[in-house]
């Protein structure tokens, strides 16, 4: 957003310097990107040549008497086109040429003193190629005036929520709220109509508002110098007085407008949706193919504009235009954004409409522009015609001013809070001492909650005044806990991955998450249109990508948030194994991962938090993405701690995975709430001993029961792991062989072989008694 200092001062009463103003702009969030200070161009003056005589000592030079508006100067000039009575540009003494950085000084040229220089266009960097002769100005230029607009130009970066600051008046309002100056009161003219508008308006797209004034008998012409200078200084091309006035109002008040040549409009103007395949010729000389999602402004025969984006060539205002229809409208920001992207058109108008313009300034902007047109071009006006409904939200926010200091970490008095909000245009009803009812102004649709008001006050009060506050200690504790959990998983052979927090709705539904999905209103990609309800689909995609690159043995995990339909996130640990597991010994190097690996990983994570897994029950997994017969849910009294199991073949098919994959999920936020006893830490100083058992049991025996029986058989047992489940030769069809590794250790002495044998016999007896099984091997 560019504007000149003098333009700003039309709306802001202040004695602040340029540097003070730009510093304050950056401090309140309107970051200054550039300041173009043209003060070095003040020495270039409009001058008139009064007399031209030959140089006494040079045939190709001339001696000129030049009037600069204050005195008569003697100038030596070599231009062929210099003549008496012409107006040109004088580089006065002390000025520096922009093209060469040459400073003008009193100089004797062939023995005659020259008190300045008459300039060509190339010497002033107005053209790239070298020009012949000096600049010849029209009679409109006044002798003594500065040739260049030397007004400093300020360029600020406006955030998307501040559409009001895409107008200079909005910027002035923010500056006034800081105390740097006073916002000048805006006087809105009241026009008297003398004719009826032959053009009526209508809205059928269901989302727009349009108003307009018919102005007859205008004399469109070149804009006056002050208006041209204003627009050209910020990079806008002057076109004609009528068009320039609409641009002037847009830059001043963030109020886009459009002027139609009224004689080129047939019937009424209707804001409607385009038909698929309709064509439109824009003012930029390009033709566009439209569709039914784009709002247009059309007459009976032609489309005269794409709503809020660009006008049509068919009703363009020219210097021959005598009657105009001046439009001021409001269009839906989302609709404008989508249409602009579809068509690949970005204009000053669409940029503002997409960020929302003030709906309540629609008529005020129309009157201001119409009054300027009457002043500069003459004419007579109709009354205002309008159609549609204005989307002017009546937003009120309940606000406790004490929250500014509480959450903003500043010290602002209630009177200061009231003063800042009032200067920003908010109106306050003091309901109680602490609770205010704040009416949000129509130009601030981004302010909807108390936090927005806190931001507004702290922004104007000064972000540099915010006190430093230490972070809560619990943040460090949580981070440290998760870091240690990551170390545990790494020690178990896993690699950590980080995946998107988004996924597609269709993928979630295939995993059984059809309810309570958190839909993203404006996703950057249709494949990422919901917040993920599970990390497992993302891990499977990573697994599939690795398998496609030849990496089939994989163990990956992620710690991160998942989301339900109310946008409540909870942290989980999810992991996946596929392919070969780490070999148990050098005789068994190609063991495939199985459900017990996933169970062991899940239990290891729970035991990391000192959960006594002996008290957890194992039930059938309720998640649809697990194999129903090879999975489980770890819980205690309906409080889920985690899930584990082999991934369902149908799920693997979605990712084109042809090998077995197992996974687990630990609900980290449930762990601290699990009503289970905590394991007491025992420092085992003495050597542990392992023994392996293999039992033949019926296939319907739950493996978890065998583990629980073994763990309860002795206090010397520290770990029980399953490392093999076998069906096949030498085993009856309804039987299976379960192989387990049991670790013994005493906290007070090294175990003897006799003690180990006694504990092992107790294990065999209890397992056979509780399962009806038999011992197959022991070693």
Curated annotation (Swiss-Prot):
Binds 2 magnesium ions per tetramer. PROSITE patterns: B5, FDX_ACB, TRBD. It comes from the Bacteria. The keyword Protein biosynthesis applies. It is an enzyme of class 6 (ligase). Coiled coil: none annotated. It catalyses: tRNA(Phe) + L-phenylalanine + ATP = L-phenylalanyl-tRNA(Phe) + AMP + diphosphate + H(+). Mg(2+) binds at residues 446, 452, 455-456. GO terms for cellular component: phenylalanine-tRNA ligase complex. Gene3D superfamilies: 3.30.56.10, Bira Bifunctional Protein, Domain 2 (3.30.930.10), Ferrodoxin-fold anticodon-binding domain (3.30.70.380), Nucleic acid-binding proteins (2.40.50.140), Phenylalanyl-trna Synthetase, Chain B, domain 3 (3.50.40.10). Its cofactor is Mg(2+). GO terms for biological process: phenylalanyl-tRNA aminoacylation. Residues 38-148 form the tRNA-binding domain. The keyword Membrane does not apply. Keywords: Aminoacyl-tRNA synthetase, ATP-binding, Cytoplasm, Ligase, Magnesium, Metal-binding, Nucleotide-binding, Protein biosynthesis, RNA-binding, tRNA-binding. Its main location: cytoplasm. Residues 684-776 form the FDX-ACB domain. PANTHER family: PHENYLALANINE--TRNA LIGASE BETA SUBUNIT, PHENYLALANYL-TRNA SYNTHETASE BETA CHAIN AND LEUCINE-RICH REPEAT-CONTAINING PROTEIN 47. This is Phenylalanine--tRNA ligase beta subunit. It comes from Wolbachia pipientis wMel. The gene is pheT.
């Amino acid at each position: 957003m560019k504007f000149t200092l003098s333009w700003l001062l039309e709306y802001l009463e202040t004695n602040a310097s340029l540097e003070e103003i730009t510093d304050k702009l950056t401090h309140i969030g309107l970051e200054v990107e550039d300041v173009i200070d043209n003060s070095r161009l003040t020495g270039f003056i409009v001058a008139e040549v009064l007399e031209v005589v030959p140089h006494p000592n040079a045939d190709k030079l001339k001696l000129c008497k030049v009037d600069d508006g204050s005195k008569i100067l003697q100038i030596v000039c070599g231009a062929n086109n210099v003549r008496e009575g012409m107006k040109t540009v004088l580089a006065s003494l002390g000025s520096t040429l922009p093209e060469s950085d040459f400073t003008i000084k009193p100089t004797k040229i062939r023995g005659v003193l020259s008190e300045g220089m008459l300039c060509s266009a190339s010497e002033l960097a107005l053209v790239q190629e070298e020009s012949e002769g000096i600049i010849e100005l029209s009679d409109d230029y006044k002798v003594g005036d500065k040739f260049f607009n030397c007004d400093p130009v300020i360029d600020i970066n406006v955030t998307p929520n501040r559409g009001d600051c895409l107008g200079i008046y909005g910027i002035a309002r923010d500056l006034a709220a800081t105390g740097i100056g006073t916002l000048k009161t805006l006087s809105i003219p009241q026009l008297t109509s003398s004719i009826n508008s032959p053009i009526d308006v209508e809205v059928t797209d269901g989302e727009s508002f349009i108003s307009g004034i018919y102005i007859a008998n205008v004399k469109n012409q070149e804009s006056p110098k002050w208006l041209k200078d204003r627009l050209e200084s910020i990079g806008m091309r002057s076109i004609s007085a009528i068009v320039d006035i609409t641009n002037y109002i847009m830059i001043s008040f963030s109020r886009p407008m459009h002027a139609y040549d009224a004689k080129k409009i047939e019937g009424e103007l209707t804001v409607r949706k385009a038909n698929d395949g309709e064509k439109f010729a824009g003012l930029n000389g390009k033709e566009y193919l439209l569709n039914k999602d784009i709002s247009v402004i059309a007459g009976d025969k032609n489309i005269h504009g794409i709503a809020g984006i660009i006008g049509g060539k068919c009703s363009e205002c020219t210097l021959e235009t005598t009657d105009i229809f001046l439009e001021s409208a409001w269009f839906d920001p989302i609709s404008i954004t989508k249409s602009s992207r579809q068509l690949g058109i970005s204009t000053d108008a669409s940029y503002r409409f997409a960020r929302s313009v003030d709906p309540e300034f629609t008529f005020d902007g129309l009157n201001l522009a119409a009054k300027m047109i009457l002043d500069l071009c003459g004419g007579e006006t109709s009354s205002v015609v309008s159609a549609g409904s204005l989307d002017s939200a009546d937003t009120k926010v309940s606000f406790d001013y004490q929250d500014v200091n509480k959450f903003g970490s500043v010290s602002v008095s209630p009177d200061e809070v009231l003063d800042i909000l009032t200067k920003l245009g908010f109106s306050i009803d003091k309901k109680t001492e602490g609770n205010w009812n704040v009416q949000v102004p129509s130009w601030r649709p981004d302010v909807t909650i108390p936090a927005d008001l806190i931001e507004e006050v702290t922004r104007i009060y000064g972000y540099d005044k915010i006190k430093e506050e230490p972070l809560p200690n619990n943040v460090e504790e949580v981070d440290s806990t998760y870091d240690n959990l990551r170390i545990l998983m790494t020690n178990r052979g896993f690699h950590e991955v980080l995946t998107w927090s988004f996924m597609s709705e269709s993928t979630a539904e295939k995993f059984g998450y059809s309810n309570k999905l958190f839909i993203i209103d404006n996703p950057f990609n249709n494949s990422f249109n919901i917040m993920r309800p599970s990390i497992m689909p993302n891990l499977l995609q990573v697994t599939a990508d690795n398998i496609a690159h030849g990496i089939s043995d994989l163990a990956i995990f992620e710690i991160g948030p998942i989301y339900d339909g109310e946008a409540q996130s909870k942290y989980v640990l999810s992991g996946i194994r596929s392919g070969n597991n780490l070999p148990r010994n050098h005789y068994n190097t190609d063991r495939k991962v199985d459900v017990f690996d996933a169970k062991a990983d899940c239990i290891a994570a729970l035991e990391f938090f000192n959960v006594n897994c002996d008290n957890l029950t194992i039930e059938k997994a309720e998640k649809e993405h697990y194999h129903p017969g090879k999975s489980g849910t770890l819980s205690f009294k309906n409080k889920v701690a985690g899930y584990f199991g082999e991934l369902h073949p149908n799920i693997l098919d979605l990712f084109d995975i042809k090998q077995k994959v197992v996974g687990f999920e630990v609900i980290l936020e449930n762990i601290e709430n699990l009503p289970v006893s905590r394991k007491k830490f025992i420092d085992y100083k003495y050597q542990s001993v392992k023994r392996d058992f293999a039992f033949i049991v019926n296939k319907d025996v739950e493996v978890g029961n065998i583990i629980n029986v073994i763990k309860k058989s002795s206090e010397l047992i520290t770990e029980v792991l399953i490392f093999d489940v076998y069906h096949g030769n030498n085993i009856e069809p309804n039987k299976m062989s379960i192989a387990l590794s049991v670790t013994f250790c005493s906290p007070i002495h090294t175990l003897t072989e006799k003690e180990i044998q006694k504990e092992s016999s107790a294990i065999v007896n209890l397992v056979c008694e509780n399962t009806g099984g038999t011992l197959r091997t022991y070693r």
